[in-house]
């Protein structure tokens, strides 16, 4: 993949768009529900994705009342939908690699997307294409539409790690003596980040952590060594986090000076305190894609498609990026995201580190439960 210079979100994501242009067709002729003056849509979403300015715009533009419920992890969302038998919500936002986990016995809890009703042509073609491999298609049906993408990388206090240039940033900073008692991380993610660090150092061979998806034996071989390294450095544990608020609090209230965080956390911290920097580590930023899906028991389908189409509008998608720092999968969103967004993107990303991103893979049958065992080992060591 090649990149224009200077690099932008748009130039990076549109690479390969010509070869996948067919994905933008057929043109969407209708926008069911959009602009109607009544109805309700029940949305279950990550806590910071749909903020008040987006709610106000949606309700004003459509006349549809938006009932918002939020969650902080894929596990929480999956468990909630399984408990309700797929009912109670019209829209949910699963990470695309987590979509397969909505299989509940013989029932799949997400329904096929009617691509004649959703403005899928607004999605960046390469993102729409790549989402297939990541899990958006199940049992031959597309069940998820790309919504946004982002990274989980390293946030650090540059006054503590004085002299550290962008090329020096590493997941290993969490285990540096300078971060003693002040390292923040999500346990499931630190297994990957530290694994990438140890792989790069030649201490744990893992095929850049892809072996943990290969087989249960390989997963345990790698995670055993990575978890042992983390536990051996438990004096650096400062704060665990499982959602955006907890990650912010780790730095703002608990005094952490280094951590693995989502991009939204790192960029928001940087806006308030410039010495806190969010950067891609040399081992590669961990990358995810979230999506929009319709639960099998959704009751308000017209309103659900109206909501999807509103989120796929470049202006609305730009609001999401400006609010959160996350990157939209909608073509044209970046032009509506504002100067702060553009500036921070240029500070964090370049052609080299974008080419070095590490993508979360679709969960394999043994992965989630096996990973949880090592999460528990780390948690219990604190």
Language-model regions: role of each:
Residues 1-11, 18-22, 26:
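N-terminal secretory signal peptides
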Residues 35, 286, 290, 295-355:
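Mature extracytoplasmic/periplasmic domains
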Residues 36-102:
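Early extracytoplasmic/lumenal segment of secretory-pathway proteins
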Residues 75, 96-238, 242-246:
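Extracytoplasmic ligand-binding site segments that recognize negatively charged/polar headgroups
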Residues 89-94, 240, 257-262:
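Paired acidic/hydrophobic, glycine-rich loop segments that form the ligand-binding mouth/hinge
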Residues 98-103, 260-275:
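A ligand-binding cleft/hinge motif common to bilobed small-molecule-binding domains
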Residues 224-233, 272-296:
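Periplasmic-binding protein-like
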Residues 351-382:
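Conserved C-terminal helix/tail region of periplasmic/extracytoplasmic solute-binding proteins
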């Amino acid at each position: 993949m090649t990149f224009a210079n200077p690099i932008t979100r748009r130039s990076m994501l549109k690479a390969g768009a010509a070869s996948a242009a067919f994905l933008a067709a057929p043109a969407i002729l209708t926008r069911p529900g959009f602009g109607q003056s009544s109805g309700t849509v029940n949305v279950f979403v990550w806590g910071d994705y749909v903020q008040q300015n987006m709610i106000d715009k949606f309700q004003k533009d459509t006349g549809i009342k938006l009932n918002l419920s939020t969650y902080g992890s894929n596990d929480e969302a999956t468990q909630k939908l399984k408990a309700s038998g797929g009912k109670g919500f019209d829209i949910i936002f699963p990470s695309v690699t987590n979509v397969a986990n909505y299989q509940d016995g013989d029932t799949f809890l997400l329904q096929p997307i009617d691509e004649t009703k959703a403005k899928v042509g607004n999605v960046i073609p390469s993102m729409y294409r790549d989402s297939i491999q990541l899990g958006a298609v199940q049992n031959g049906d597309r069940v998820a539409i790309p919504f946004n993408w982002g990274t989980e990388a390293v946030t650090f206090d540059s006054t503590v790690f004085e002299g550290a240039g962008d090329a020096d940033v590493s997941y290993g900073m969490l285990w540096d003596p300078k971060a003693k008692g002040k390292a923040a991380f999500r346990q499931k993610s630190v297994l990957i980040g530290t694994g990438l660090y140890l792989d790069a150092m030649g201490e744990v061979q893992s095929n850049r952590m892809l072996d943990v998806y290969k087989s249960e034996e390989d997963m345990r071989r790698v995670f055993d060594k990575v978890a042992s390294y983390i536990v051996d450095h438990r004096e650096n544990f400062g704060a665990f986090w499982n959602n955006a608020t907890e990650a912010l609090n780790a730095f703002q209230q608990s005094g952490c000076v280094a951590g693995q965080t989502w991009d939204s956390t790192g960029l928001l911290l940087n806006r308030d305190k410039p010495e806190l920097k969010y950067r891609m580590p040399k081992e590669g930023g961990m990358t995810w894609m979230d999506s929009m899906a319709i639960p099998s028991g959704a009751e308000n389908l017209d309103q659900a498609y109206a909501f999807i189409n509103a989120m796929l509008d470049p202006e609305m998608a730009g609001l999401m990026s400006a609010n959160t720092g996350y990157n939209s999968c909608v073509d044209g969103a970046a032009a509506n995201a504002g100067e702060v967004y553009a500036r921070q993107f240029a500070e964090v990303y370049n052609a080299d580190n974008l080419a070095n991103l590490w993508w979360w893979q679709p969960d394999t049958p043994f992965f989630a439960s096996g990973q949880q065992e090592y999460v528990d080992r780390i948690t219990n060591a604190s």
